[in-house]
Every structure is written in structure tokens, then in C-alpha cells.
């Protein structure tokens, strides 16, 4: 028999009727609780009962169970009721509290379990000890398997698992619970209330989170809807733009087609030979109608004429292309014809100053005189004039000079024959202004004669605008050309006395009645090509400029630009682009004031450029020596005068010699000018001859050019000092847009420096 082992007091306090908690120790060690029960009827035969905790069955190893089974088999020699009772207690102690609870609620199940365990133990007691050992191990395994099945079955019937998740002290509460007294746990209502509060808080948080998610989802829906709407609007806008572009392209194609048709018509009309067509006043229309019809002339109906008036009526010349167009469209109303001639006048209204080459005097008389009209071919020309500014640099913009700024010694009046034509029955009182004409305007004048343009007022207006733009563009180009021609063909610029004498004799031959009108009839020569713009004059002018005052093999060296000129080069171009009609003197004043207003820091880059140009010029021309322009003097009535004194005397003489407007020629700004053909023997008019006066202000042509009042003027130029020019620094080939200032403007530029 086995003796009872010495047990510690904590193990003896616990009886078999109160099993240990299945969740006893946290480390999972096996705790054996033993107690001795002495039966009243078998006082000396008490059998010890070994109680195993619940978690022993869950151990993967079975050493503990084998030791317990060996001790049980050796101590039990016979079956007794106490043994069976202890076995029942062993079975019951191995069950968890939940299983005990289930057993208490279902006694039938508990009895079956007890019976089965008793039978298995009884069977294990029979036979040899080895067999009993094996049978006990089988019983233990069977019990473990059954208890596992019971635990799995009893899981749905357990209390809600939320208590284990939410309660932090569930271990203590379960340890405090008895095996059968589950309802005696203290603090259960409070803990449940706390758990309910926690659950409500979680529910509220989840509800608020759900609302936030729904709100965010709604915002996303709204944002997506707005984006879709924006995309739709953008697509509509793009579609509208594409439609508009398509319409514009279609309109452009239509306009291009119309332009092609008009060009074809112009080409057909342009094959007709252009002639010089005089336009007669209304009272002479009946007399010249037959001859004009024979010669291809066209007489406009829009001009009025008052007999006996002193106002000039220039003889106008219209190309035969316009006559052919008017003849091809006999149904034109007077208003349409007026529009047509208005377009022609707009094309011819060029700012006075630039002259386009015209026809020689012989061709002039032949062109103006039809076969059935008798004209008196009498020409008048002002006496020879001398140039006061012989070495004056080129002035590319027209310099406005009134009647008080002209002198007999300056070639401001060209040597162009004056023609006063009188008809057989009634003489024509006609004078002309000196306004230039454009060769390129023939295209516009021809294009507006087509039927499509004659019936469209907008087209005529557009043609007028184009004509004005073209005349402004070419006016500046012609001014440069005329300045060079004057320098090359002036009387005082002739290199030999032979040339001077030949020009003087030619002038005397052309001089007719000096007291007649000093204005010739306006003419247009449409037979001139673009190559006949005075290219010969340009070449002669350049040859003269390069060889003036030097040896034949000594080239002229330009001075390097200073800082002011470097800065003014671009500024002058900008001002001319903004104000094409601004005179050079005004531009120089503006540039001088601007340069003075600039700070040294702003001028620094231009001074650096000046230093670079000076260094480059010194390297290129190491032997260069600047020779300034000499002072010029004039001999007036045997007296040697400076230019300023001479101009003052001439101004006073002109004021004394002024005559009333009725007997003097009056030039209006809108009058049509005559264009003279520059020839090797006839100098063209300088660009500063007839500048555009103020609107509505007549420019009185003085009579200082009459032979009787012309003083003998001779300009003395020191040949030894003429080599070099003040502002002749850089070639016009390098910068065609650059302007060359005159003496007064150069002085202002030097003061600005």
C-alpha cells in the first residue's frame, strides 16, 4: 500500500470537492492537488485519490498521466465503492466549470459519463499489471478525447465572448467563481453596465465614422459631377472654336478665290498699253471728249471748275487701265465713279518731299497734248540755284521748310520744265503742287477698277488705306534717293566747269516766261519700271561722295560712332516706326533730351560699345586722321557772308518781295504733285524742297527765284579742308534705316554728348 505523502498546507486546505481552477497558474505548470478522504465504513482502508487539473489533458506529453496511472494501479488491489466514488470524483474534477455546469443541468449525461469511466477503470483493473497499465493509458486518452469533444460542443453555449475582449480582469473573476456557484460573482452588474457604456461609445464612434464616410462619399460624387460638367463645357467650347475656325477657313478660301479672280482680271487689263491721260475740268469736257475717246483718255465727272479763279487745278493723268475698266462697266453710277477717283487720289496723295522720276520735257508736252487739242508749249524754270549745304550729309526724312526757309542759292527748286498748257478755245488756269507719285500704286489703281470693287464701298476704302500705307513706305525710300541725286547733280557739286556751263546753258534754254506760274502740271508716268528709280543717280552720287576732296585712289574712311550715336541708332528707328512723318530735327531734339535725362549707369553699355568700336576702327585704320568739315561762306553782292547771315538776308528779301495769294502760286497739302525724271543734266528736287505743311495752311511760293531779283551767289569751299564730314561715320550700306542729321541736328547731337 502507498502511504500518504507529506503535503504542504496549501494543498491540504483544498479538498476534492473543490477542484482547482482550470486557469490556475499562468506558467502552465501541472499542479497536483491531493487529499485524503477517510470513509466512515472503511476507516483503515482509505484509498488516496489523485485529482488532475483540467489543463493536464491538454498537455501534449503523457508522462504525468502514466505516473498517476502506475500509482493508482499499485495501490488498488480490489474494487470498492470508495474507489468508484473517487474515480467519479476524478472524472468530475477533470471537467471544466462549464462542463460541470452542463453536467448539473443534465444529470443523465453526468451519470453516463460516470458509468463509462467506471467500466473502463474496472476493465483496466483486470488482468496482469502490464495489461492494466495499457488499459489505463487508453482510458486516459479516451477521457481526453471525450472532454475535447464536449468542450467543442459546449462553446456555442458559453457566455458571449465579448466579455473576454472587453473585460481586463476576466481571469480574476473566473478564479473567484466557484465550481457550481456562477451566480455568486460579485460586481457583475457594474461590470456589465461598464461594458454596455463602452459598447455604446464604440457604437457612437462607429456611427460618426460612418456619417463621415458617407459625407466624404457625397463630396466625391459632387466633385466628380462638377468635373464632368466642366469637361462637358470645355468640350462644347472646343467644338465651338473648331466650328469658328472652320468658318474662318472657309471665308479665307472664298476670299482667296475672289483674289485669284481679281488678279486674273488685272492681268487681262494690264496687257493694255498704259498712256498718259490728262483730266480736264468740267467745262472743257465737251471739247476734249472726242479726242479723249480716241486716245483712250478718261475724264472724271467728280471735279468742278470755276472760271477765273486763282486756285490751281492740276492736270491729272489716269492710266488707260482705269479708262478700260470704266468703259467695260458702262452702268457705273456717279457715286461709284467718285469712289473710284477717290481711291486714285488717295494713292497719289503722297507727302511732299520725295519725287519719283517722271518723263522728259518733250514727252511731257506730247503726253499732255492730244491731237485735237492745241496747247501752247511754253516752259518756265527758275534761274539756276546754288546749294548752300554742299557737304551736308544725307537727310532721309523730309525737312519741312516754308516760304521763309528757301533761298536762291539752295537747290530746293528742281530744274524741271514748267508747262502751262492752254486749250484752243479757253485757257486752263492750272497749277500743281510738288507731291510725288508711286509706281507701285498702279497695281492698286488697276485692282480697284474691277466690277467687284466698283460695287463694294468697303473694298474701295480698303484700297485707299493700302495706297496710303504704300505711299508712306516708299516715300522714305525715295527721299534718300533724291538726296543723293541732288548731291551728285547739283550745279555747285559738278566736278568740272564744263558740266557747270552745260547745265547753265540748258537752264537758260528751258527758262521761258519767268513771270508765269511757278508750278507745273502734275503728271504720272506709269511706263516707268522699278529699275528706273534713279539707279544711275545713286551710282554717280556714291562715286562723287567717295572721291570728293581726296585723291582718286584715296578712300573715304567713316568715323566710328560715339556712345550717343550707338544709342540713337535704334531709338531713331523706333521713333520713325511710330511717327513716319516726323522730321529729322524734331527726332534729334527728342533724342538729345532723352540722352541728357539718362543716368551714367544707363549710358555705360553704350560707352563700352563706343570704346569697342573705336578700338576696332583704330586696328582697321591705324593712320586715320579726322578732318572736320570746313566753314562755308557765300559771296552775296560782292560780300563774303556766312551761311547764317546769308539766310537771314534772303529771308528778309523774300518777305519784302511777297505778293498777294491771288497772284502767287498756292500749294495745298492734298494736291497731286508732278514727278520729274532725273537725268544726267537735270538735278532732281531735294527731299526738303516741298515738305508737308500744316493741314489747311497754304504754302506761298515766293518770287525770289525771278531772274531780276536773283543775286549773284558763289560759294567758296576750301578744297584742302573738305576731306571728311562731320557725321559721315558709317555707310548707309551697313544700316539702310539710319538717318543722317544736318548741321543743326549734328550740333544738337554733339551738345547731347
Curated annotation (Swiss-Prot):
Residues 453-487 form a coiled coil. The lineage of its organism: Eukaryota, Metazoa, Chordata, Craniata, Vertebrata. Residues 397-413, 685-699 have a biased composition (Low complexity). It is found in: Nucleus. Gene3D superfamilies: High mobility group box domain. Residues 557-625 bind DNA. This is Transcription factor Sox-5. It holds the Pfam family HMG_box. GO terms for biological process: cartilage condensation; cartilage development; chondrocyte differentiation. It comes from Xenopus tropicalis (Western clawed frog). Residues 726-742 have a biased composition (Acidic residues). The keyword Cytoplasm does not apply. Residues 1-27, 357-418, 679-753 are annotated as: Disordered.
Amino acid at each position: 500500500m502507498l502511504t500518504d505523502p507529506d503535503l504542504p498546507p496549501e494543498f491540504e486546505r483544498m479538498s476534492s470537492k473543490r477542484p482547482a481552477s482550470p486557469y490556475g497558474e499562468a506558467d502552465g505548470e501541472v499542479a497536483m492537488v491531493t487529499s485524503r478522504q477517510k470513509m466512515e465504513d472503511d476507516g483503515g482502508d482509505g484509498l488516496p485519490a489523485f485529482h488532475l487539473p483540467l489543463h493536464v489533458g491538454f498537455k501534449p506529453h503523457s508522462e504525468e498521466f502514466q505516473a498517476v496511472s502506475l500509482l493508482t494501479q499499485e495501490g488498488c488491489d480490489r474494487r470498492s465503492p470508495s474507489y468508484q466514488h473517487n474515480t467519479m470524483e476524478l472524472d468530475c474534477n477533470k471537467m471544466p466549470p462549464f462542463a460541470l455546469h452542463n453536467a448539473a443541468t443534465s444529470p443523465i449525461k453526468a451519470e453516463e459519463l460516470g458509468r463509462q469511466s467506471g467500466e473502463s477503470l474496472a476493465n483496466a483493473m483486470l488482468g496482469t499489471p502490464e495489461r492494466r497499465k495499457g488499459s489505463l493509458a487508453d482510458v486516459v486518452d479516451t477521457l481526453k478525447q471525450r472532454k475535447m469533444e464536449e468542450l467543442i460542443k459546449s462553446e456555442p453555449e458559453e457566455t458571449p465572448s465579448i466579455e473576454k475582449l472587453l473585460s481586463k480582469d476576466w481571469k480574476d473573476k473566473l478564479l473567484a467563481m466557484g465550481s457550481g456557484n456562477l451566480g455568486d460573482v460579485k460586481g457583475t452588474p457594474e461590470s456589465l453596465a461598464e461594458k454596455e457604456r463602452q459598447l455604446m461609445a464604440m457604437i457612437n464612434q462607429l456611427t460618426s465614422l460612418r456619417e463621415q464616410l458617407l459625407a466624404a462619399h457625397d463630396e466625391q460624387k459632387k466633385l466628380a459631377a462638377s468635373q464632368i460638367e466642366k469637361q462637358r463645357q470645355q468640350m462644347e467650347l472646343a467644338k465651338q472654336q473648331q466650328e469658328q475656325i472652320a468658318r474662318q477657313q472657309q471665308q479665307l478660301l472664298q476670299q482667296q478665290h475672289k483674289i485669284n479672280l481679281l488678279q486674273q482680271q488685272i492681268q487681262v487689263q494690264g496687257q493694255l498699253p498704259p498712256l498718259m491721260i490728262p483730266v480736264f475740268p468740267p467745262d472743257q469736257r465737251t471739247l476734249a471728249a472726242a479726242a479723249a475717246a480716241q486716245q483712250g483718255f478718261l475724264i472724271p465727272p467728280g471735279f468742278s471748275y470755276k472760271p477765273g479763279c486763282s486756285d490751281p487745278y492740276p492736270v491729272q493723268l489716269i492710266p488707260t487701265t482705269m479708262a478700260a475698266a470704266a468703259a467695260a462697266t458702262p452702268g457705273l453710277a456717279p457715286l461709284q465713279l467718285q469712289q473710284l477717283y477717290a481711291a486714285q487720289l488717295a494713292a497719289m496723295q503722297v507727302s511732299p518731299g520725295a519725287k519719283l522720276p517722271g518723263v522728259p520735257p518733250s514727252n511731257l508736252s506730247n503726253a499732255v497734248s492730244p491731237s485735237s487739242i492745241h496747247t501752247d508749249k511754253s516752259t518756265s524754270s527758275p534761274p539756276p540755284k546754288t546749294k548752300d549745304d554742299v557737304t551736308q550729309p544725307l537727310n532721309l526724312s523730309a525737312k519741312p521748310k516754308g516760304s521763309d526757309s528757301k533761298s536762291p542759292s539752295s537747290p530746293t527748286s528742281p530744274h524741271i520744265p514748267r508747262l502751262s498748257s492752254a486749250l484752243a478755245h479757253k485757257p486752263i488756269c492750272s497749277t500743281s503742287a510738288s507731291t510725288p507719285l508711286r509706281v507701285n500704286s498702279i497695281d492698286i489703281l488697276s485692282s480697284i477698277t474691277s466690277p467687284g470693287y466698283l460695287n463694294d464701298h468697303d473694298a474701295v476704302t480698303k484700297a485707299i488705306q493700302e495706297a496710303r500705307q504704300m505711299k508712306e513706305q516708299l516715300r522714305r525710300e525715295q527721299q534718300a534717293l533724291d538726296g543723293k541725286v541732288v548731291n551728285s547733280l547739283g550745279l555747285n557739286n559738278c566736278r568740272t566747269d564744263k558740266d557747270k556751263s552745260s547745265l547753265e546753258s540748258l537752264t537758260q534754254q528751258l527758262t521761258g516766261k519767268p513771270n508765269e506760274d511757278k508750278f507745273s502740271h502734275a503728271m504720272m508716268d506709269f511706263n516707268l519700271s522699278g529699275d528706273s528709280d534713279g539707279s544711275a543717280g545713286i551710282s554717280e552720287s556714291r562715286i562723287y561722295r567717295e572721291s570728293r576732296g581726296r585723291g582718286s585712289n584715296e578712300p573715304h574712311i567713316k568715323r566710328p560712332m560715339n556712345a550717343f550715336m550707338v544709342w540713337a541708332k535704334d531709338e531713331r528707328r523706333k521713333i520713325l516706326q511710330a511717327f513716319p512723318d516726323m522730321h529729322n530735327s524734331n527726332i534729334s531734339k527728342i533724342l538729345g533730351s532723352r540722352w541728357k535725362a539718362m543716368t551714367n549707369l544707363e549710358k555705360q553699355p553704350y560707352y563700352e560699345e563706343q570704346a569697342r568700336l573705336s578700338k576696332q576702327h583704330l586696328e582697321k585704320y591705324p593712320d586715320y586722321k579726322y578732318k572736320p568739315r570746313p566753314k562755308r561762306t557765300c559771296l552775296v553782292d560782292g560780300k563774303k557772308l556766312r551761311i547764317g547771315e546769308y539766310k537771314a538776308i534772303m529771308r528778309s528779301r523774300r518777305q519784302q518781295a511777297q505778293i498777294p495769294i491771288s497772284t502767287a502760286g498756292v500749294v495745298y497739302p492734298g494736291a497731286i504733285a508732278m514727278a520729274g525724271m532725273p537725268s544726267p543734266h537735270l538735278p532732281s528736287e531735294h527731299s526738303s524742297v516741298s515738305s508737308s505743311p500744316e493741314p489747311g495752311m497754304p504754302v506761298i511760293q515766293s518770287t525770289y527765284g525771278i531772274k531780276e531779283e536773283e543775286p549773284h551767289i558763289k560759294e567758296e569751299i576750301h578744297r584742302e579742308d573738305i576731306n571728311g564730314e562731320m557725321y559721315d561715320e558709317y555707310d548707309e550700306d551697313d544700316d539702310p534705316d539710319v538717318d543722317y542729321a544736318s548741321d543743326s541736328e549734328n550740333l544738337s547731337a554733339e551738345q547731347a554728348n
